[in-house]
């Protein structure tokens, strides 16, 4: 093959790859059995929110998949964390939204726009692995604060968007 022809083939290949990336405008993180790392997936969705990406949480669709506008930054984060994802085009995403909107299915889309500030009600001397919730949040790399009686008395709870309480805190 002549050098000129091989250069044309290389250029056409890169143009083809570039055109595919332009068409894939959404990144989907499935949460069903195809997901390799469910807990890190939550961390990626949380990180996307902290970076001010809007995330669609697709309830009862692929196990509660997360979808957001394509971002190389989030794609790289998925790869780094071992999180399964795939790319779809705008027309494919609209078809998914139509499927979810069907009243005969028990599915919905919740728009997540802000990363919540999270607190876990737990004694200060507990380590993350002593408690299932803090263990999961730590593994998923979702930041949280531990609050206990002193913080409740000092009225710091309004500083948080989400407070996790264990049921045994009230049932003994």
Which role does the model predict for each range below?
Residues 1-6:
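N-terminal secretory signal peptides that target proteins for export/translocation
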Residues 9-19:
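Bacterial N-terminal signal peptides
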Residues 17-19, 53-60, 107-111:
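Short, flexible, solvent-exposed loop/turn segments with mixed acidic/basic and small polar residues
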Residues 20-24:
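Sec/Tat signal peptide C-region and signal peptidase I cleavage site
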Residues 26-27, 32, 36, 69-76, ...:
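Helical hinge/lid and interdomain linker segments adjacent to catalytic or ligand-binding clefts
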Residues 40-79:
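N-terminal, post-signal-peptide region of Sec/Tat-exported proteins
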Residues 81-114:
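Short N-terminal or domain-adjacent regulatory/targeting segments
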């Amino acid at each position: 093959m002549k050098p000129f022809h091989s250069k044309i083939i290389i250029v056409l290949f890169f143009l083809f790859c570039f055109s595919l990336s332009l068409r894939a405008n959404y990144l989907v993180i499935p949460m069903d059995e195809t997901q390799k790392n469910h807990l890190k997936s939550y961390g990626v969705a949380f990180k996307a929110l902290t970076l001010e990406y809007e995330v669609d949480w697709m309830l009862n669709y692929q196990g509660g998949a997360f979808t957001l506008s394509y971002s190389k930054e989030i794609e790289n984060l998925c790869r780094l964390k071992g999180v399964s994802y795939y790319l779809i085009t705008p027309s494919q995403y609209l078809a998914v939204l139509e499927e979810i909107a069907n009243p005969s299915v028990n599915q919905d889309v919740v728009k997540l726009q802000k990363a919540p500030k999270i607190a876990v009600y737990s004694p200060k001397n507990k380590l993350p692995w002593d408690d299932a919730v803090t263990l999961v949040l730590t593994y998923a790399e979702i930041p949280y604060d531990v609050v206990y009686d002193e913080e409740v008395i000092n009225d710091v709870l309004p500083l948080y968007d989400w407070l996790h309480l264990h049921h045994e805190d009230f049932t003994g």
